[in-house]
């Protein structure tokens, strides 16, 4: 099952990269693979080829993309992503409380983590150009970060840093979070934030 946003342009060979990676995975395993987003602002791969479809410079993108080096990484850029349909069904897909979409990707990933998935791998050569949530801008934004915090007791940032090790170079299956000073300090901040939103900010 391939998941993607409706404001993404899929770059050449994206599907071949996914397919080749699948050949290296054990049959019937649960996993989460993601591609790499190219965006017109400072982020993962920064290359400004237009912020709207009317401004889109496809020629510039296709000319410059092969020259940009990027490593496979831990965690995920959320979408585009590839997962087994059986894995999607095990966790019930996206959670409706995050509609219209903000926060749904990290929530989905945390459900996969709780299922036991430990292969969260970002593929550097599976690339999409992302115009950055044009569809969501037309809708009311939900507070996905707050919803995630109240649901799981952790922030999205904490999950990405200590669980997914997001944006670190890929070096194999993820392990349980390293419970060092940074972990407990960030966890304490999470608990204060949870208490505030759960009990104080509700009045």
Which positions does each model-derived feature cover?
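Active-site donor/metal-binding and catalytic loop motifs
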Residues: 38, 99, 121-139, 147
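A short, conserved alpha-helix in the catalytic core of glycosyltransferases
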Residues: 18, 74-83, 87-92, 98-126
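Conserved donor-nucleotide/metal-binding helix-loop-beta segment in metal-dependent transferases, i.e.
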Residues: 13-32
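Short beta-strand-to-loop element that shapes/binds the nucleotide-sugar donor at the catalytic cleft/hinge
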Residues: 31-50
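Short beta-strand-to-loop acidic/aromatic patch adjacent to the donor-nucleotide binding site
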Residues: 1-11
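Non-catalytic, C-terminal membrane-associated alpha-helical segments of glycosyltransferases
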Residues: 140-143, 150, 162-203
């Amino acid at each position: 099952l391939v998941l993607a946003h409706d404001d993404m342009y899929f770059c050449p060979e994206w599907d071949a990269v996914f397919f080749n990676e699948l050949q290296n995975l054990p049959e019937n395993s649960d996993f989460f693979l993601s591609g790499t987003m190219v965006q017109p602002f400072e982020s993962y791969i920064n290359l400004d080829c237009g912020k709207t479809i009317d401004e889109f410079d496809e020629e510039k993108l296709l000319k410059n993309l092969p020259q940009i080096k990027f490593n496979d990484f831990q965690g995920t850029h959320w979408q585009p992503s590839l997962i087994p349909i059986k894995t999607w069904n095990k966790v019930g897909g996206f959670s409706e409380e995050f509609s219209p979409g903000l926060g749904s990707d990290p929530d989905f990933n945390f459900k996969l983590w709780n299922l036991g998935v430990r292969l969260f791998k970002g593929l550097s050569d599976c690339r999409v150009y992302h115009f950055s949530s044009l569809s969501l801008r037309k809708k009311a934004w939900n507070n996905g970060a707050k919803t995630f915090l109240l649901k799981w007791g952790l922030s999205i940032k904490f999950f990405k840093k200590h669980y997914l090790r997001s944006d670190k170079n890929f070096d194999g299956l993820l392990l349980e979070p390293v419970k060092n000073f940074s972990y407990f300090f960030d966890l304490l901040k999470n608990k204060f934030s949870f208490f505030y939103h759960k009990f104080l900010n509700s009045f």
